[in-house]
Amino acid sequence: MNQKLLKLENLLRFHTICRQVHSPSQRRLLAWCRHGFAPASSVWRDLLGARSWQTDMLIGSALHQHRLLVTKKEKRPPRSQLSPVKTKKEVEVWVGMTVEDLASAMAKDIDCVYEALLNTAIDVDSLEANSHLDEVWIKEVIKKAGMKLKWSKLKQERIRENKDAVRRPGTDPALLKPRSPVVTVMGHVDHGKTTLLDKLRETQVAAMEVGGITQHIGAFLVSLPSGEKITFLDTPGHAAFSAMRARGAQVTDIVVLVVAADDGVMKQTVESIQHAKDAEVPIILAINKCDKTDADPEKVKKELLAYDVVCEEYGGDVQAVHVSALTGDNLMALAEATIALAEILELKADPTGPVEGTVIESFTDKGRGPVTTAIIQRGTLRKGSILVAGKSWAKVRLIFDENGKILNEAYPSMPVGIIGWRDLPSAGDEILEVESEPRAREVIEWRKSEQKEEKGKDDLKIMEEKRREHQEAHRKAREKYGSLHWKERSYIKFLERKQQRPLKPKEKVERQSNVLPIIIKGDVDGSVEAILNLLDTYDASHECELELVHFGLGDISENDVTFAETFDGVIYGFNVEAGSAIQQSAAQKGVKIKLHKIIYHLIEDLQEELSSRLPHTLEEYPIGEASILATFTVTEGKKKIPVAGCRVQKGQLERHKKFKLIRNGQVIWKGSLTSLKHHKDDISVIKTGMDCGLSLDEEKVEFKPGDQVICYEENKVPTKTSWDPGF
């Protein structure tokens, strides 16, 4: 209304001015101006201004009352004329909704959702229309859109369908058929496990293993003279492969615990017992090396009582068999005990329907691609079967046994090699058969998306933790600097930045010399896993940082050499090879490649490499020892110098070596001599039995009769890493 009045007022003023211009008096003034007889500017302004002022006064007085009346009315309009309060739009959401679902629920374009998620921790580029959003991101989008969130009562029903493959439920008892037992041989290193298996199957597996130590799991089907069959898993016994032993216990029916009669219970023996108990697998005790003269089987049984392994002789249910793997004595009794226990367990499986199994080991073969060793636990495996394991799948091209013989079918309890995997599954992964390749891809995609979602949740937790840490640091900073003057605050911050200054070149070299980047390559998945588990025990980072740059399977490649060159690292290979071209390339780039076939040697080599990165230490080597018999002072100029009269007890004192003074077993001084005399002659060496006088480079030190003077030299010696891998 005020705007309209203002326009009316301006219009009336303009109209008044126009009338004045066209009046006779005004026309006369304009004519004078045209003919050059214009009056002075002040007179002109007075004439026109007076009339304008009078007109303005008339218009102002006419409109003043009306303007006030309108303004009063506009100040408080009637309640009925007030615009209604806008309420936020309510959006119904549910757990697990996709980007497309959220956009549809908001009645917005899908780009609005992407725009709302910009500048957040979520990777917008990786989002698709069917990507599932966590609750925190759903709330964020709704908040930025200025809407109100409402959780759907049916949100549980809207969660996406689980598309994973799972094991079948219980089987009809009528379909169950007896199967061979799967037996895992466990025990301490070099207690004779592989030799025992070698005798049972009459092969030379033990001779094929480097150093007689099994490096990774072997699965074998052993046929006994009685016609019975037993599947044996031979797991390594030394500390590096405890994870592989644990995996063996997860797929086994019976554990044969091998303990040497002369060594007794060892560290890995105890670990094997724990693995069996955790998996709730019964134990058969095989006391090996009973042919030795110092064998004591009864001592072994008594030692095992402390670990709740009670033999039948002591009222327990654990069968104990005394054997000699070297001579073959009593091995049939061990096999019969295994079969007897299997009969008690009534081991059965369903050979029909989709296949179920477990990956025992996996590796990459140059000519055949990814290969797995597996134990079939249910169903019958055939060529052409579609399998999924972990996040990889296969269309079976080839099935073979432990001897390389091609098989058409594989039944429950059979150990087989499988070829046809698209990617390499991990040892311990569950094998499941699905109906088709599209279904296999669907399962893999589901598992990858689940893993990605879990990773997103973990990342969110980490971000939240970092946010809390940042807030706490900010709060502490405010408490620290809040009461200080800005000059004091600036000075303190300057000192703190100075302490965190960039390293100088020399310091940088010293810092880098205390870091060892390494690359690990192994022949099979289980071996690499065992090495990584060993590296997890590294606890000497205060001496030298151990950085794992890369690990993988297969022979050393050019990429590995490039990695090592980039990080100035060392390549360690276990049961793999490096071609001549690779070795030549590594030599040109200054990259070390270290290949080993026994894990002990690899770890020892790694310890030596770590030790080489450590600074040398100084060790004292005594040269001679003398006792102080008397003390006196000698005047030189204005100084009085204390002198000790000594007699050499051991070795000799050399003038230019280092000395230390010991009193009551405590070192009270270290340094050099200023003089060494025999009678009045300066000499450089005093031998055993001779008397001498000596003075120190520190005059404040007081001698006392009975003190010991030690002459020594310092030598630099290499420092050994304190890391103990547990062998």
Swiss-Prot record:
It comes from Mus musculus (Mouse). Residues 178-346 form the tr-type G domain. Coiled coil: none annotated. GTP binds at residues 187-194, 234-237, 288-291. InterPro entries: EF-G-like_DII (IPR053905), IF2_II (IPR044145), P-loop_NTPase (IPR027417), Small_GTP-bd (IPR005225), T_Tr_GTP-bd_dom (IPR000795), TF_IF2_bacterial-like (IPR000178), TIF_IF2 (IPR015760), TIF_IF2_dom3 (IPR023115). Pfam families: EF-G_D2 (PF22042), GTP_EFTU (PF00009), IF-2 (PF11987). Gene3D superfamilies: P-loop containing nucleotide triphosphate hydrolases, Translation factors, Translation initiation factor IF- 2, domain 3. Residues 324-326 are annotated as: G5. Transmembrane segments: none annotated. One of its GO terms (biological process) is ribosome disassembly. Monomer. This is Translation initiation factor IF-2, mitochondrial. Residues 187-194 are annotated as: G1. GO terms for cellular component: mitochondrion; nucleoplasm.
